Amino acid sequence: MMQEETFYSVRMRASMNGSHEDGGKHISGGERLIPFHEMKHTVNALLEKGLSHSRGKPDFMQIQFEEVHESIKTIQPLPVHTNEVSCPEEGQKLARLLLEKEGVSRDVIEKAYEQIPEWSDVRGAVLFDIHTGKRMDQTKEKGVRVSRMDWPDANFEKWALHSHVPAHSRIKEALALASKVSRHPAVVAELCWSDDPDYITGYVAGKKMGYQRITAMKEYGTEEGCRVFFIDGSNDVNTYIHDLEKQPILIEWEEDHDS
């Protein structure tokens, strides 16, 4: 059993013009969940990721690891579908439609979209209440940082081959995060596109439709990203934040699980 082995949460964040706390520009972040023997390799990979990012050259970086004491849950990745669109306008229109299909009202979707430009500097995710149409979390610029999830490479590569998806670490990380977030009972849907100027694909994810990639969500060269979790829950928002930050999750795809 996997549980016998001790796992470590490894995290990286990099910024330019000082640390994030000092108002520096966010460059890159990374989250891994690994056994100890992969530590050197993982730390080097995160270092490389932070140093070679298209958002710029960092002058502040932090890499930390800690032992995880909570028991690790293993889950399936969300099913993936790629939607080819010809322009960001078409992509955003489709995203709104998919959010509605997933159970977010049109009114709440529009309220979120009105505020998305203001949230472009939020480093983590914004939690948005589907009842009030207001932001729930009080984390301001920091956002909620989903952590402690990973997808072991060998299994991911097998999945990518089977799913006819390129085996890029970007897809691995995004799908691992979306799969962890989506399994939370209070999360109705996630809307995301990257703050990386070189990457314009985004997605809508949810329990009903899985992970819906959309090939154009913004113009090339723009550094405004988005990550919004639409929440339907009466519990205290801090319990949701705790789950997303602390519950350790490993993705493990099994071929017969996919329809």
UniProtKB/Swiss-Prot annotation:
Record-listed E.C. numbers: 6.2.1.14
Name of the protein in its database record: 6-carboxyhexanoate--CoA ligase
Top-rank taxon, per record: Bacteria
Any GO MF annotation of the entry: ATP binding
Keyword Cytoplasm set for record: no
Family: Belongs to the BioW family.
One matching Pfam family: BioW
Subunit organization: Homodimer.
Keywords: ATP-binding, Biotin biosynthesis, Ligase, Magnesium, Nucleotide-binding
The protein's required cofactors: Mg(2+)
Gene name of this polypeptide: bioW
GO biological process: biotin biosynthetic process
Upper taxonomic lineage: Bacteria, Bacillati, Bacillota, Bacilli, Bacillales
Pathway annotation from the record: Metabolic intermediate metabolism; pimeloyl-CoA biosynthesis; pimeloyl-CoA from pimelate: step 1/1
Cross-referenced InterPro entries: BioW
Its biological purpose: Catalyzes the transformation of pimelate into pimeloyl-CoA with concomitant hydrolysis of ATP to AMP.
Catalysed conversion reaction: heptanedioate + ATP + CoA = 6-carboxyhexanoyl-CoA + AMP + diphosphate
